[in-house]
Each structure stands twice: as C-alpha cells, then as structure tokens.
Regions:
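Conserved alpha/beta enzyme-core scaffold
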Residues: 1-176
Length: 176
C-alpha cells in the first residue's frame, strides 16, 4: 500500500527497522479500508485494539462497514452508562461482555454458529472478509511473524482477505 512515512514522532522499534518501509501508524493503516468492506477483527487476547480504536476514531471513517468477530475482550468502547459507542455495524458469533450492550442497542447481529464452522464458511465465501485486522509477534530473523495465541479462525480470514493489517505486539509469543 503506498503511503507517506510515519510522523517523525513515531519511533520504529529496532526489531522492525528492516521493514521500515512497511511500518505505518494505525491511523494510516485503517485509512486503506474501503466503503462497504467486511472487516474481520482478531479474537480474544489477540484483538488488535490499537487498530480498532484508530478505526473507531477516524475523522472520516469508511461508510457501510461491517465488523466481523468472534470473541472480543475490552476491544470496543462503551460510555459510562455501559452503552456501546461503536460507529459501525457488527456481526458476531459469540455474545461476550463487549457485545451485550451493543446487541441490546441493535448495533450487532448475533449469528449462533459453532466457532468450528466459521473457517469453512469464510473459505466458501458465505462469510465475506475483505479486510483482516490482526495482531502478530515481531518478525523473526527470517522476517516471519506469528499469530501467537490466536490461531483459531484468523488463518481463514487472512487467506480470504484482500487486505491484511497487522498490529505488531512485542509481547506476543510465537506459535508454530
């Protein structure tokens, strides 16, 4: 994706120096999301919170986005009364604390489906994924990153997405 370099106040970690031309701010990254995209958000403790917050706080967010996710924890904002403040439509396969208020507000479609079926549905195109927002480990000596603790439905979303935006987490462990 063509982009301008990150602002000078944005420090690129040493581990990412060899990939400096691919490092952008969260705001720049989510700026590549198009109107009408179906955006998969990584799950559980591997939810890319910085990317989600950048998308939610974008000055001119893309229109008609659908955020698709399974299990999220403290990923989406709520006001002091507990109401969801998301700006987008959501589709979820799990009703956790993040989504309860939004479901009551009519902002989320709950799809009762076993998580074991979700990867097949994505692969068959029955669940659309245009963009995948994920969290990964820093690259190893060969430039490979790891999905770490979240290798549930993320591989299916990555393989189907037109655009994959990864938030690098230095604390993410590597998995095989």
């Amino acid at each position: 994706m063509p982009h301008s370099p990150p602002p000078s106040s944005f420090a690129i970690p040493v581990a990412l120096q060899p990939y400096a031309e691919r490092v952008v701010t969260a705001e720049q990254a989510v700026g590549e999301i198009r109107n009408g995209d179906h955006v998969f958000v990584g799950t559980g403790c591997a939810a890319p919170r910085t990317l989600v917050q950048a998308l939610e706080s974008a000055i001119s967010p893309p229109a008609d986005l659908e955020l698709l996710h399974f299990f999220t924890v403290k990923t989406f904002n709520h006001d002091p009364q507990g109401h969801s403040t998301t700006r987008f439509r959501h589709r979820t396969f799990f009703v956790g604390t993040d989504m309860r208020a939004a479901i009551k507000q009519g902002l989320v479609d709950y799809v009762p489906m076993s998580v074991a079926r979700v990867p097949d549905m994505i692969a068959l195109g029955r669940i659309a994924v245009d963009v995948a927002l994920i969290q990964v480990s820093p690259p190893d000596a060969f430039g490979y990153v790891s999905l770490g603790i979240s290798v549930d439905i993320i591989p299916a979303a990555i393989s189907r997405a037109r655009l994959v935006i990864a938030e690098v987490n230095p604390a993410m462990p590597r998995s095989q």
